[in-house]
From Swiss-Prot:
GO terms for biological process: translation. One of its GO terms (cellular component) is large ribosomal subunit. It comes from Dehalococcoides mccartyi (strain ATCC BAA-2100 / JCM 16839 / KCTC 5957 / BAV1). The keyword Nucleotide-binding does not apply. GO terms for molecular function: large ribosomal subunit rRNA binding; structural constituent of ribosome. Transmembrane segments: none annotated. SUPFAM superfamilies: Ribosomal protein L10-like. This is Large ribosomal subunit protein uL10.
Length: 176
């Protein structure tokens, strides 16, 4: 019996180690006062955004953190902790959780986060949630880069367009 428990714990540590190894960002939450249906709703919203969510056993989470480059996050594992993490969009865990908390008046509390190999405060998580997604930022950059090119094309086409208008007017004048 003890051996089965040890094997299950090792599997849990290995899975969490893998999750921490690929996570670019994470948000830690205190889930006290959250019922199962609300927790399921949170997981669904996070999954739709490509974000993983795990309820953690603190001792196993500390062991998993020791197995990765993120051993400095062990301080976040106190009390009932769940972790939302993403390997793709750095902003997604913070944005989805903060939107959910503000829209549902949930008892879920953000206790901190992890970004760029350091722990961040609740205030920094809130600021991170306000940032636009990666796709929006890329489109803004591309629009900014495209704007001068479009202007240049309009300027270069201006004389040709003007010549075409003058020629069209001359043709009408000769016909009529």
């Amino acid at each position: 019996m003890v051996k089965k428990i040890r094997i299950k714990k090792k599997i849990a540590v290995d899975e969490l180690t893998d999750a921490l190894a690929v996570a670019q960002s994470a948000v830690f939450t205190d889930y006290r006062g959250i019922n199962t249906s609300e927790l399921t709703t949170i997981r669904v919203k996070l999954r739709e955004a490509g974000v993983g969510y795990r309820v953690l056993k603190n001792t196993l989470a500390r062991r998993a953190a020791d197995n990765t480059d993120h051993s400095n996050i062990k301080g976040a594992f106190e009390g009932p902790v769940a972790m939302a993490y993403s390997s793709n969009d750095v902003v997604a865990p913070a944005r989805v959780l903060m939107d959910y908390i503000s829209s549902s008046k949930s008892n879920l509390k953000v206790t901190g986060g992890y970004l760029s190999n350091k722990l961040i405060s609740v205030e920094e998580v809130a600021e991170l949630a306000k940032l636009p997604s990666r796709e929006v930022l890329i489109s803004k950059i591309l629009a900014g880069m495209q704007s001068p090119i479009t202007g240049l094309a309009m300027v270069l086409n201006g004389p040709a367009r003007g010549l075409a208008i003058v020629l069209q007017a001359r043709i009408k004048q000769l016909e009529g």
